[in-house]
């Protein structure tokens, strides 16, 4: 009889003692227990803000006078024959200028569009990276590449890697939480917050939208804590006995741990999602008083409350279905709506984190899966829009370990691609890990005979934006 079998057979005679507690002595450690970082990193938590669809960098973050000069004209040949830009569209068309005014802000003199008036007031806390490149011009592979480091499904997401490397600081809440757009699911679905080839314990936990992010948080009528504990122990006994007879039990181990976590969350999660204790001033800071900003504002406020309670990685997804940032046409109508939905909530998040002393330990990252082209996509003649551009993405970071007001990289005069060295998306991943105290080359996992890592062949840590 093995030790595990002895534990199983002893279960009923031990008066219903939690099997999870019994196995803890044997397993030696919880996969989500806090772990020491490889390096000294200021960031203990990360909030990753992902704008799905491909955000137009030249309409929000990059002031390019040449777009005004060439408005309505064909782009110079040297620019419009770059890589996939020459083939993805039928043909590069007339240049369309930004339809919104730009102004410089803060001590850093950062140019920002007037579509982001609230974020413009936070630029001295942010660091911008220009000319970021992904390896595919289509949404699906580009989303995967940005959020998992690989163009194809099956790889571990950024949040999974971070929790694998650092564990979680709160055993009563998930270490990696995801909040999606209320209008639908993101491209790739659960894969973009999944564990991939990592153990299933590191996958993200999805919170629902609206005022009830977690369903069935309250036990059903007549269910006492003692009775629920007994039921859970019996269920765990069956699951663990099943697992003992098999080798690859990552999914089942994660399910057992999830049941235990759900039991503990009944006492801790209600306080997390209950916003009644927040002041009206705080709620307005996030835009909860405006139906346009209330949805994403609620998620940003919850994200602050999560990192406040030790959740390691929080991912917020904005844009879904026909309401993504994918402005092939009618950009004058669509981009202001998307921008307004997130501008005040994200600025509120940065200001709130800073006022509470949380920003210095919380890394905030903003990204999309691609940028846009300077020329008209010409889908609808009188409603111009911009095409996909895998070369011109802008990413910004703020908080833990980031140099306030810094800028790295630049794009050409038409905001098509990097004017100097490109910034592959793996450089963003490498920098994120470094700010969290993780070495990209030591954060590995053996799978199918190869040591996998988030940055694949390796990325450059962008030291120019690190304080």
What are these regions (language model features)?
Residues 1-467:
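Ligand-binding pockets and gating/stacking loops
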């Amino acid at each position: 009889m093995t030790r595990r079998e002895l534990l199983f057979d002893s279960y009923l005679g031990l008066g219903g003692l939690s099997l999870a507690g019994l196995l803890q002595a044997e397993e030696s450690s919880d996969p989500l227990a806090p772990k020491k970082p490889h390096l000294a990193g200021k960031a203990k938590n990360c909030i990753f803000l992902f704008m799905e669809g491909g955000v137009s960098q030249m309409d929000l973050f990059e002031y390019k006078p040449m777009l005004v000069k060439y408005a309505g004209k064909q782009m110079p040949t040297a620019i419009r024959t770059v890589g996939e830009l020459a083939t993805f569209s039928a043909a590069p068309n007339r240049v369309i200028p930004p339809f919104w005014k730009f102004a410089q802000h803060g001590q850093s003199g950062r140019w920002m569009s007037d579509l982001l008036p609230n974020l413009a007031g936070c630029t001295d806390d942010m660091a911008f990276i220009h000319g970021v490149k992904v390896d595919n011009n289509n949404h699906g592979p580009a989303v995967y590449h940005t959020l998992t480091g690989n163009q194809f499904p099956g790889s571990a997401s950024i949040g999974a890697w971070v929790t694998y490397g650092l564990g979680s600081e709160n055993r009563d809440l998930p270490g990696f939480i995801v909040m999606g757009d209320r209008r639908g699911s993101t491209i790739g679905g659960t894969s973009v917050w999944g564990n991939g080839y990592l153990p299933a314990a590191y996958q993200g936990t999805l919170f629902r939208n609206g005022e009830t992010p977690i369903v069935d948080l309250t036990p059903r009528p007549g269910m006492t804590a003692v009775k629920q504990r007994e039921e859970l122990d019996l269920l765990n006994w069956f699951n663990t006995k099943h697992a003992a007879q098999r080798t690859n039990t990552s999914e089942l181990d994660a399910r057992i741990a999830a049941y235990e976590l759900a039991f503990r969350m009944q006492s801790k999660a209600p306080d997390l999602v209950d916003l009644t204790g927040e002041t009206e001033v705080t709620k307005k800071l996030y835009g909860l008083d405006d139906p346009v900003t209330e949805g994403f504002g609620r998620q940003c406020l919850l994200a602050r409350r999560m990192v406040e309670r030790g959740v390691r990685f929080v991912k917020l997804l904005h844009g879904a279905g026909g309401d993504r940032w994918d402005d092939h046409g009618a950009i004058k109508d669509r981009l202001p709506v998307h921008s307004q939905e997130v501008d005040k909530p994200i600025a509120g998040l940065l200001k709130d984190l800073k006022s509470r002393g949380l920003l210095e330990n919380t890394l905030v990252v903003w990204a999309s899966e691609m940028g846009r082209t300077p020329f008209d996509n010409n889908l609808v003649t009188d409603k111009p829009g911009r095409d996909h551009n895998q070369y011109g993405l802008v990413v910004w970071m703020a908080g833990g370990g980031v140099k306030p007001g810094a800028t790295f990289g630049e794009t050409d005069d038409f905001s098509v691609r990097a004017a100097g060295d490109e910034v592959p998306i793996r450089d963003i991943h490498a920098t994120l890990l470094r700010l969290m105290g993780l070495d990209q080359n030591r954060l590995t996992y053996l799978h199918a005979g190869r040591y996998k890592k988030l940055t694949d062949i390796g990325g450059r840590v962008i030291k120019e934006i690190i304080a």
